[in-house]
């Protein structure tokens, strides 16, 4: 059986940057998981004493606090800056962008629509920067019945599917007088999704590696599943099952933006032994 990696996969710029920031900081606490990958979070805690807290209220004797890649709410950031703790910002610059857009557009009188998961930390942070009406949706149907102002601004969670974002934009174009569309989907997300789709079209089995709480990894899995029925989402090589590969000729592999190369290599090595 041949094993082929997608042409684009794994660690993105924002995650690489955040990992380096955390390693350089050492002896610190992150506000929420730095990234959505439990294996890498454990490595940072073990090797660099970077622990994970659920929120700013858990800070006690820490000297340094690292803001996660997904960002935190505007209010939490303001509260954090009132303390004597050194604040180290590892928010991905691609996440900072929709935060700034929401703040600016709401100040200019626009209603703001965020395409994304309202429970995701990135979306919670982005939403907190809007000062007026703000709506978080995943489906066009959720927009029905909303009485918008004349002006609406649309942004996206950075890890969503472009096609779905365009559907939301098209709906709004038909229902509001003025629409500002800001494509805030990360380029790395788009490239990884396209690469996974192209590989899944040819593969007999697809393995998607990443945190099961990771939005971009889930999107990769769903895209892969559309084109390759035998697609599986795993966090480590321990989840692989021999039966998945029976009678298969091509095994495709992709990985989420928070998945380090060392985990990917472990999966590849295990599959080679099947």
Curated annotation (Swiss-Prot):
Isopentenyl diphosphate binds at residues 36, 70, 120, 214-216, 258. (2E)-4-hydroxy-3-methylbut-2-enyl diphosphate binds at residues 36, 70, 120, 158, 214-216, 258. [4Fe-4S] cluster binds at residues 12, 92, 186. Its cofactor is [4Fe-4S] cluster. One of its GO terms (biological process) is terpenoid biosynthetic process. It comes from the Bacteria. Dimethylallyl diphosphate binds at residues 36, 70, 120, 214-216, 258. CDD domains: lytB_ispH (cd13944). Its EC number is 1.17.7.4. Binds 1 [4Fe-4S] cluster per subunit. GO terms for molecular function: 4 iron, 4 sulfur cluster binding; 4-hydroxy-3-methylbut-2-enyl diphosphate reductase activity; metal ion binding. Pfam families: LYTB (PF02401). It catalyses: isopentenyl diphosphate + 2 oxidized [2Fe-2S]-[ferredoxin] + H2O = (2E)-4-hydroxy-3-methylbut-2-enyl diphosphate + 2 reduced [2Fe-2S]-[ferredoxin] + 2 H(+); dimethylallyl diphosphate + 2 oxidized [2Fe-2S]-[ferredoxin] + H2O = (2E)-4-hydroxy-3-methylbut-2-enyl diphosphate + 2 reduced [2Fe-2S]-[ferredoxin] + 2 H(+). Keywords: 4Fe-4S, Iron, Iron-sulfur, Isoprene biosynthesis, Metal-binding, Oxidoreductase. Disulfide bonds: none annotated. Catalyzes the conversion of 1-hydroxy-2-methyl-2-(E)-butenyl 4-diphosphate (HMBPP) into a mixture of isopentenyl diphosphate (IPP) and dimethylallyl diphosphate (DMAPP). Acts in the terminal step of the DOXP/MEP pathway for isoprenoid precursor biosynthesis. PANTHER family: 4-HYDROXY-3-METHYLBUT-2-ENYL DIPHOSPHATE REDUCTASE. This is 4-hydroxy-3-methylbut-2-enyl diphosphate reductase. It comes from Campylobacter concisus (strain 13826). The gene is ispH.
